[in-house]
Amino acid sequence: VTKREGMDKLLEFIRKGDFYTAPASTRFHSCHEGGLLEHSLNVFHALTAKKTTGIWQEKLKDVAYESLAICALLHDLCKTYFYTTDYRNKKNEQGIWERVPYYTIDDKIPYGHGEKSVMMIEEYIKLLPAERYAIRWHMGWTEPKENYNALGTAMEKYPLILALHEANLEATYLMEEKQ
């Protein structure tokens, strides 16, 4: 629980939107109704577990639980109002064509991924620098290679970036179902 100014308005934005019903992706991890919430909670569990484990105990000792929660639960806020449902024909087990729903992207705010989440969050609350950087860079080494120097420098300054990136990967590849 946080007393951060504006959190009530951010939570209202989340409740009124599709955060609880949106998928986390169109065809990969948690690509089902409620997948974004599921993924965010999985990242939260993976990230908070790191704080008490191995090398992360030292690296994250000064990072408040509140910051872990904000980063993990809101890192993909940019995926709200991002997906729509469309339909296509697909053969069922009997070989009969059926009209089936699938998720597609409708990016109304083409501002990047981590950057957009930071922008959306900061419409309501002020992020701490480590939170801002962690959310911005949470995709880690999937960034274009031209960004690797900046990413590496940022990770050295804020280990929370790497911890969130790893937690995101753990949730995606170890905790969630693929389609």
Name each model feature, range by range:
Residues 1, 178-179:
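N-terminal intrinsically disordered, low-complexity tails enriched in polar/charged
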Residues 9-16, 29-41:
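All-alpha helical catalytic cores of prenyl diphosphate-utilizing isoprenoid enzymes
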